[in-house]
């Protein structure tokens, strides 16, 4: 029979860890939030501060499915800013482990960023960008003072900011790279989301082998036919090795997703067979891999 003390301890252990992301518009809040999302955090954008304790409570009831929550708080919710300190006090009383991350940047850097995207500052009204920046600094002054971590992004690019977030929150967790290996047919067009494209039309086409034509590259006989062609296995070995090199570089640069497109004429035989083999090689190297055969059923 469980005691009340044991039950309370179990409930306390289930309370999610919380990170509140705030800071200057244009300083990188979205990038910081995306980094935490890629590390497995449950991220909520522009949640009114008064609802943060409710979000934490819902996470505590998720039976461990939501162990880490990140909430982005910015000037779009300025009407609710007065509730933030009250919410933080509530969280502290509950024993919630929470951190405030504040993204900072110089006026010059922020002006350049707003001008580069040709967007107004959310607080500038009829004034200039610098007027909006000044108003926002004043609005966020107390929150910045309460921050557990202030990151100045004035001279940082996206990859450098991600590296700083990883250093703070990844712990021993290696940044994951998720790869999609997609077979396709050139006759149906290139995949618009492909990062890398490779062409299998240098191999003989099983379409012209009557007993293989009805099947796809998932068929063992078709796959063997493709892989036993001159140059096929050498290509597989060399390209798989190249992909491992590229994957290591993507991890260093903070890239989390890559789509490798493998094409042939119709996307039914050669590209399908080679995609399966390449995906298996990537998975064996620890890359989380998904295989998609975009055009396999179109003929």
Curated annotation (Swiss-Prot):
Residues engaged in binding ATP: 23-30
Entry superkingdom: Bacteria
Binding-site list for GTP: 74-77
InterPro entries: P-loop_NTPase, RapZ-like, RapZ-like_N, RapZ_C
Keywords for the protein's UniProt record, in alphabetical order: ATP-binding, GTP-binding, Nucleotide-binding
Any one GO molecular-function label of the UniProt entry: ATP binding
Family in the record: Belongs to the RapZ-like family.
Classification via HAMAP family: RapZ_like
Name of protein: Nucleotide-binding protein SCO1952
